[in-house]
Swiss-Prot record:
The keyword RNA-binding applies. This is Large ribosomal subunit protein uL6. It comes from Cutibacterium acnes (strain DSM 16379 / KPA171202) (Propionibacterium acnes). The lineage of its organism: Bacteria, Bacillati, Actinomycetota, Actinomycetes, Propionibacteriales. Belongs to the universal ribosomal protein uL6 family. This protein binds to the 23S rRNA, and is important in its secondary structure. It is located near the subunit interface in the base of the L7/L12 stalk, and near the tRNA binding site of the peptidyltransferase center. The keyword Ribosomal protein applies. PANTHER family: 60S/50S RIBOSOMAL PROTEIN L6/L9 (PTHR11655), LARGE RIBOSOMAL SUBUNIT PROTEIN UL6M (PTHR11655:SF14). Keywords: Ribonucleoprotein, Ribosomal protein, RNA-binding, rRNA-binding. GO terms for molecular function: rRNA binding; structural constituent of ribosome.
Length: 180
């Protein structure tokens, strides 16, 4: 039995979970998320209102889908109650970010032009100062993907560490060429 998959998912107050066959919908104070469960895995509610994820047998694929499904549904419950946030920071002389509203950011990252990033559905941006900002939303996957796409615009380079990085990320530094 999967160690993660067998754990019941506690549903906090204010969160409504609808189960309709293979379709799961989670509604909470921050929004609504839905998910279609792959065929051999079944989702049900127990007497206390917790969600149970079960598999028919110990086939390899079913074992992996069991833990995955439980984790995805748990992430949905956390997303609609607390939400997710990825913090990023910019390092480099003249590198900065400007907010063009909660759905758009403008980056000056050493290119000949500013780079404008639009937020996908369900994502908002918050700018703390010109070198720190965050990506927020209820869907963990979309928040992480949006943050990764922004980081990809100008990855931290290994010599001076200039670029966009996650908060707390350690950039591996290289030694420059030795002078005479």
């Amino acid at each position: 039995m999967s160690r993660i998959g067998r754990l019941p998912i506690a549903v906090p107050s204010g969160v409504e979970v609808k189960l309709d066959g293979q379709y799961v919908e989670v509604k909470g104070p921050k929004g609504t998320l839905n998910f279609t469960v792959r065929e051999p895995i079944t989702v049900s509610k127990n007497d206390e209102g917790a969600i149970l994820v079960e598999r028919p047998d110990d086939e390899r694929e079913n074992r992996s889908l069991h833990g995955l499904t439980r984790t995805l549904i748990n992430n949905m419950v956390i997303g609609v109650t607390e939400g997710y946030e990825k913090k990023l920071e910019i390092q480099g002389v003249g590198y900065r970010v400007l907010s063009k509203g909660p759905k758009q950011l403008e980056f000056n990252l050493g290119f000949s032009h500013p780079v404008i990033v639009d937020a996908p559905e369900g994502i908002t941006f918050a700018v703390e100062n010109p070198t720190k900002f965050s990506v927020q939303g209820i869907d963990k996957q979309v928040v992480g993907e949006t943050a990764a796409n922004i980081r990809k615009i100008r990855k931290p380079e290994p010599y001076k560490g200039k670029g966009v990085r996650y908060e707390g990320e350690n950039v591996r530094r290289k030694v420059g060429k030795a002078g005479k």
